Amino acid sequence: MIITIDGPAGAGKSTAARMLAERLGFEFLDTGAMYRAVAWACVARNVDLNDAAAVSETAASISIQFEVERIICNGQDVTTEIRSAEASHAASIVAAVPGVRLEMVRLQRESASGHNYVTEGRDQGSEVFPDARCKFFLTA
């Protein structure tokens, strides 16, 4: 079963999703962390963030795994690094790249397939998981 939580920045999506997942015994899919991991990989590889092809190629070439309270990118725990101001800024740039978006949507769907997930983030209920059983939209 998939439960999605959408809404604007600062609405409390991540907090609500984490709490709901814990309460239901579901896994939590932090989609923002996925974009941050792509941004981190781009910065670590000195990829020009204005080069959409290179950014998309980076997104397609990395491995992103979720473990309990940790984000693993290419075998490295990047949980702390992806929360930096630099990664946040870079994430907003890479998230606007269509190739990155396609790859992240593919990965989100693949990750959730056959699992019970609470997922939050941009367009989760409308685009990523349009057939989700429960969809919420939070406002600040």
Across the structure, where does each feature detected by a protein language model lie?
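Hydrophobic anchor at the beta1->P-loop junction of P-loop NTPases
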Residues: 3-5
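Walker A (P-loop) phosphate-binding loop of P-loop NTPases
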Residues: 10
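Conserved lysine of the Walker
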Residues: 13
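Hydrophobic positions on the alpha1 helix immediately C-terminal to the Walker A/P-loop
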Residues: 16
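Post-Walker A helix-loop "phosphate-sensing" segment adjacent to the P-loop in P-loop NTPases
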Residues: 21-31, 44-47
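Short active-site oxyanion
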Residues: 25-27, 116, 134
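ATP-dependent small-molecule kinase phosphotransfer cores
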Residues: 33-117, 123-128
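Conserved phosphate-donor/acceptor-positioning beta-strand/loop module used by diverse small-molecule
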Residues: 130-140
